[in-house]
Amino acid sequence: MGLPWYRVHTVVLNDPGRLLAVHIMHTALVSGWAGSMALYELAVFDPSDPVLDPMWRQGMFVIPFMTRLGITDSWGGWSISGGTVTNPGIWSYEGVAGTHIVFSGLCFLAAIWHWVYWDLAIFSDDRTGKPSLDLPKIFGIHLFLAGVACFGFGAFHVTGLYGPGIWVSDPYGLTGKVQAVNPAWGAEGFDPFVPGGIASHHIAAGTLGILAGLFHLSVRPPQRLYKGLRMGNIETVLSSSIAAVFFAAFVVAGTMWYGSATTPIELFGPTRYQWDQGYFQQEIYRRVSNGLSENLSLSEAWSKIPEKLAFYDYIGNNPAKGGLFRAGSMDNGDGIAVGWLGHPVFRDKEGRELFVRRMPTFFETFPVVLVDEEGIVRADVPFRRAESKYSVEQVGVTVEFYGGELNGVSYSDPATVKKYARRSQLGEIFELDRATLKSDGVFRSSPRGWFTFGHATFALLFFFGHIWHGARTLFRDVFAGIDPDLDAQVEFGTFQKVGDPTTRKQAV
């Protein structure tokens, strides 16, 4: 037909039956990818250590999304929380993956059917006998159905009225589990970290969608508005649909990167801001000081810190530490975490407790500096030993571990002290297994980083797509010389000027 590759979609422009067919095929591809990806991830996922080797450390991408919607069990007999299960049924990881693949197959067959039987009576205008779609009516139908689905999700699935609920956790990602959520109708519902807002917003948005859908089904648009917004042109639908998608992509990129109730850290890993603000470090110190006030020893207080909380306070779990083009999971970077060595406490020969200054997010290397509780530099690992005044050897720094595997162990050997001081720059110290996966020691990002990068990038591309197609549909007559009221079926590519039989192209 002589179409360039970037204009091939014009073949379905005036063909409602085949336009439907290609969209059904697209749904088949999306659903098939989701199911296949889920099965692949389940094949490589190791559920044995949900604390030190959770799904986000292993680079799982679709498993966290299934889990946040209430799926926790596998046909393999394991549960995401670390327990064992028997007969999880269809509401399981494999069950949902399988239903997506079956649905994909059905959509594939439906797409073929609609491609073959494209000339259906439903697409024909009774008055003219030509193919046409009542786009405002279709908009009303879709808005109504989307509203029903949205309302149903918020009122039944999230609330547990008919469904499992959603993943809910505490602010430090320690006690997460799937549970029913009551809608939050007050001001707290607008807090992005309050799960109740998910239920209330879906109920409210769904109700609005249902009412808006009924409005558009019962009220016809004014003629001037219909013509002004080109409501009879399918490219108007494309443009506004792209707008909806890019807006949603920008929103979820934000909720993922900055964190929200919809992106729990147990499923997607911590955010970079939790490292930047010392979020987990403050909570750990608060718990230790509470333990000391209850007359626990320093060793006992640190031993009560959950390993899960200590692991969050490690820079290797910061999604901003991985480069955008470093492929692979976090486990492929710094290795699989095996155990917490404990919290190192450094002291100089005068008995002052020293604190290692932590590495900021965007540094690859950082000077090792130890300060006292007033922030005064007391020791360092100097770049030039000849000019040093605060070296570990000169200041007589020692280190003692509290909690973890090295609880009660102390070192005064300068080389060992410096080793642990360097590692303290990166947060709590963990033993990491690099051999199993041949990990290269270079930090990787978590699924939180990948999701944000992907959605922000595609949102930007789709923004330009919205502008492009919006301009094309609003100024179609200017760009192509086509009368905006032209309703004849034309074959694109046959004529140099669309619809003008006097400009037939010559066969080469």
Curated annotation (Swiss-Prot):
One of its GO terms (molecular function) is electron transporter, transferring electrons within the cyclic electron transport pathway of photosynthesis activity. Binds multiple chlorophylls. PSII binds additional chlorophylls, carotenoids and specific lipids. GO terms for biological process: photosynthetic electron transport in photosystem II. The chain crosses the membrane at residues 21-36, 101-115, 140-156, 203-218, 237-252, 457-472. Keywords: Chlorophyll, Chloroplast, Chromophore, Membrane, Photosynthesis, Photosystem II, Plastid, Thylakoid, Transmembrane, Transmembrane helix. One of its GO terms (cellular component) is chloroplast thylakoid membrane. InterPro entries: PS_antenna-like, PS_II_antenna-like_sf, PSII_PsbB. It comes from the Eukaryota. It is found in: Plastid, Chloroplast thylakoid membrane. It is a multi-pass membrane protein. Disulfide bonds: none annotated. Belongs to the PsbB/PsbC family. PsbB subfamily. HAMAP family: PSII_PsbB_CP47 (MF_01495). PSII is composed of 1 copy each of membrane proteins PsbA, PsbB, PsbC, PsbD, PsbE, PsbF, PsbH, PsbI, PsbJ, PsbK, PsbL, PsbM, PsbT, PsbX, PsbY, PsbZ, Psb30/Ycf12, at least 3 peripheral proteins of the oxygen-evolving complex and a large number of cofactors. It forms dimeric complexes. This is Photosystem II CP47 reaction center protein. It comes from Brachypodium distachyon (Purple false brome).
